Structures are given as structure tokens and as C-alpha cells.
Curated annotation (Swiss-Prot):
It holds the Pfam family PKI. Ubiquitous. GO terms for molecular function: cAMP-dependent protein kinase inhibitor activity. Keywords: Protein kinase inhibitor. Signal peptide: none annotated. This is cAMP-dependent protein kinase inhibitor gamma. Disulfide bonds: none annotated. It comes from Homo sapiens (Human). One of its GO terms (biological process) is negative regulation of protein import into nucleus. Residues 1-10, 65-76 have a biased composition (Polar residues). The keyword rRNA-binding does not apply. Extremely potent competitive inhibitor of cAMP-dependent protein kinase activity, this protein interacts with the catalytic subunit of the enzyme after the cAMP-induced dissociation of its regulatory chains.
Length: 76
């Protein structure tokens, strides 16, 4: 019973008492990346070619989305 009590007191004295499953702290790695840096990195992303792909593939999607009957022909 002493083992349970010592581990309980260790847990109560740590700063993770409110977390479910009491996972280890991983704050060290996440502190290195700030929200401002992440927003800047996302702002640098480019969507090259996305506009041409959407315009070029629209007729193909319309033709491919027609329902087929059980004999394999497309219905009008």
C-alpha cells in the first residue's frame, strides 16, 4: 500500500494533475515554433497550377459524374 501512496503523492505534487492519463510534458519542442512563424510559413505557400487544373478538369468531371444504368450505359 505504500507504493500506491508514494506514486499518488508524486502525481499530486506534479503539474499534470488535471490531465487525463497524465502524459509527459512535450512543451520543449512545441515552444520552438511560434504561431507567428507558422502563419508566416503558411503565407509563403503557393498554389501554382491549381487554377488551371480546376478549369481544365471541369468538363471531364461533368462527363464522369453521369449515373450509369445497370447495363453500363449512361443515362441522359
Amino acid at each position: 500500500m505504500m507504493e500506491v501512496e508514494s506514486s499518488y503523492s508524486d502525481f499530486i505534487s506534479c503539474d499534470r494533475t488535471g490531465r487525463r492519463n497524465a502524459v509527459p510534458d512535450i512543451q520543449g519542442d512545441s515552444e520552438a515554433v511560434s504561431v507567428r512563424k507558422l502563419a508566416g510559413d503558411m503565407g509563403e505557400l503557393a498554389l501554382e497550377g491549381a487554377e488551371g487544373q480546376v478549369e481544365g478538369s471541369a468538363p471531364d468531371k461533368e462527363a464522369g459524374n453521369q449515373p450509369q444504368s445497370s447495363d453500363g450505359t449512361t443515362s441522359s
